[in-house]
Design a protein with these regions (language model features):
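Positively charged, small/polar-rich N-terminal and surface patches that mediate targeting and assembly
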Residues: 1-108
């Protein structure tokens, strides 16, 4: 199993979730986060915004589904041409074990 963390722009999170659900990947966890990447925030006039609002999605999937999920997120979350700074990041981690609390059982 893999755990995919996707940091996307807030205005893209609904579209990403819908595309994932339409492809059969409806289970995810979402929360609001703030941070900055290479651009270190933005400056508007004299105001400097060090951190930008983003949404983080967490998706646990089978190894075989990882590439399709990543492709869906990248295609849906991109706001313009390739290389547009600030569109987000995707991180993939291995999942060693998973448990369902209600049944107190280890998942396969």
């Amino acid at each position: 199993m893999k755990m995919i963390y996707a940091i996307v722009r807030p205005e893209k999170v609904y579209e990403v979730n819908k595309a994932l659900a339409d492809a059969g990947y409806g289970a995810s966890t979402k929360w609001s986060v703030a941070g900055h990447g290479k651009q270190h925030g933005i400056q508007v006039g004299e105001l400097v915004y060090d951190e930008m609002s983003k949404n983080m999605l967490m998706i646990v999937c089978d190894d075989d589904d990882k590439n399709e999920i990543i492709d869906i997120i990248m295609d849906t979350a991109q706001t313009g041409e390739s290389g547009n700074s600030g569109d987000g990041r995707i991180f993939v981690l291995p999942v060693e074990e998973s448990y369902t609390i209600s049944s107190q059982s280890k998942d396969d």
